[in-house]
């Protein structure tokens, strides 16, 4: 079934066929904090403050102020759903993405009238207003404004003509203005905007919203796995076995995802910076993946919007920042990156990788490692160091043996309790640049931290020493199929 998924609507149709994976409501909802507040209880999960849980995706059919639009949330807020949408098993997702990176299928131009341009609104229209055209929610009452959390930003380098797709923090700032936040030195489109600014040029950009989940997952790869010049839309093409189709924008010299629900066209303005919370003055941006509300930036870049195009009766897609949806989008590409790097260095040892919900998909990874010979003792720790190299934002790595389910944190903690000694099996790497959104990465937290964003990376080696394996066999139960006893 999943091979038929090519856009948001076919993805939702697939989930509709699966028990307990999609619910719809006709009760009107306010996109300002209420919508996210509802879904927090229904299925956000992740690092969201409890009570929350993993639950179904949800469609709100009646959104206050937007009579012709729906809002979908939580599509990727379950590893099981992501696997179904990509036609694989949950435990195979990282390896599948790793293969897709190695066998990319580049995007192609769409022929004909693009679905995303069925309705066109130009910024020159007298009644043009982003607030009315795009039902972007706020997650909490403290948010700087309405946020587009699942916008696929697509741009072209002004010198090299290479393309890139990335998800960025986008806040509606006015009727025809968006702010965009670039993590300093970490994102390709940020580098493109900086180069365009050096040249005194505007950077054309398209923002596609409501697309094939394969695009959303693929767009979250980062260097070194996908260096500058690698178009992550090629990963989505490989996942689907066919290229992503792009159409020419209506008002700027750029392309957009042809079957998106919405496309926002515009230009990143050189020399222009805006205060992210200039309209709310709350001091906050929005809830971020670590589970805290991030501070508003006073140096966001400015996008001058030139058009909004969309399908007829469009579906806005959104996510809650700290939800399980972010864990899926950030974590699974990280798993693929770690697996690919370690497999090249020491083939056959790394069995699997899981980037846990507790780390928001970025801060924590569990590596399932198989020691094949006495000389493999110590290689598990080398694998952890490679993981830190593959993904700089990673903070903690847990190492477990092949008989431990790396996707079950209770099993991981069991290994920690029975195969780990704190004075022997903790390896720390202090003073390493990590992720700026971790509030403990700050000199105020510890005098050993020289600058905000620097952390102590830690390895927890919960593997059995190779020469002691015979003493750590788990209880062996009878292997059988229990279905005979479960039939009614």
Map each language-model feature to its residues:
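Extended, highly charged
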Residues: 1-302, 306-488
């Amino acid at each position: 079934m999943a091979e038929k998924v090519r856009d948001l609507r076919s993805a939702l149709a697939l989930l509709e066929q699966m028990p307990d994976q999609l619910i719809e409501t006709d009760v009107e909802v306010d996109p300002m904090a209420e919508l996210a507040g509802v879904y927090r209880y229904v299925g956000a999960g992740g690092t969201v403050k409890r009570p929350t849980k993993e639950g179904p995706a949800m469609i709100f059919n009646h959104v206050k102020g937007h009579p012709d639009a729906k809002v979908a949330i939580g599509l990727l807020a379950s590893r099981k759903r992501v696997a179904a949408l990509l036609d694989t098993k949950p435990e195979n997702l990282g390896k599948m993405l790793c293969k897709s990176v190695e066998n990319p299928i580049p995007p192609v131009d769409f022929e004909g009238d693009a679905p995303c341009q069925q309705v066109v609104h130009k910024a020159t229209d007298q009644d043009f207003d982003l607030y009315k055209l795009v039902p972007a929610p706020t997650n909490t009452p403290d948010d700087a404004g309405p946020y587009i959390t699942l916008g696929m930003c697509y741009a072209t380098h002004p010198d090299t003509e290479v393309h890139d797709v990335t998800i960025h923090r986008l806040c509606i700032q006015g009727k025809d203005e968006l702010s965009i936040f670039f993590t300093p030195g970490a994102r390709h489109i940020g580098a493109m905007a900086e180069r365009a600014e050096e040249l005194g040029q505007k950077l054309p950009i398209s923002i596609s919203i409501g697309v094939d989940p394969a695009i959303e997952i693929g767009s979250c790869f980062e260097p070194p796995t996908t260096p500058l010049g690698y178009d992550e839309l090629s990963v989505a093409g490989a996942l689907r076995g066919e290229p992503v189709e792009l159409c020419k924008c209506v008002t700027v010299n750029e392309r957009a995802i042809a079957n998106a629900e919405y496309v926002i066209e515009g230009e990143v303005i050189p020399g222009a910076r805006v205060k992210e919370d200039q309209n709310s003055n709350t001091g906050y941006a929005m809830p971020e993946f670590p589970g805290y509300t991030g501070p508003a930036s006073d140096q966001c870049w400015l996008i001058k919007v030139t058009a909004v195009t969309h399908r007829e009766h469009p579906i806005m897609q959104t996510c809650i920042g700290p939800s399980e949806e972010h864990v899926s989008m950030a974590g699974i590409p990280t798993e693929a990156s770690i697996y690919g790097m370690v497999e090249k260095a020491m083939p056959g040892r790394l069995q699997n990788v899981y980037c846990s919900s507790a780390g928001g998909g970025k801060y924590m990874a569990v590596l399932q490692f198989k020691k094949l010979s006495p000389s493999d003792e110590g290689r598990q720790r080398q694998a952890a160091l490679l993981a830190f190299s593959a993904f700089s934002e990673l903070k903690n790595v847990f190492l477990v043996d092949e008989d431990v389910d790396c996707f079950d944190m209770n099993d991981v903690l069991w290994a920690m309790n029975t195969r780990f000694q704190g004075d022997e099996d903790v390896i720390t790497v202090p003073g390493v640049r990590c992720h700026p959104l971790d509030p403990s990465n700050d000199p105020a937290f510890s005098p050993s931290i020289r600058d905000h964003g620097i952390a102590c990376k830690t390895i927890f080696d919960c593997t059995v020493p190779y020469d002691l394996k015979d003493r750590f066999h788990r209880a062996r139960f009878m292997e059988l199929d229990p279905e005979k006893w479960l039939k009614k």
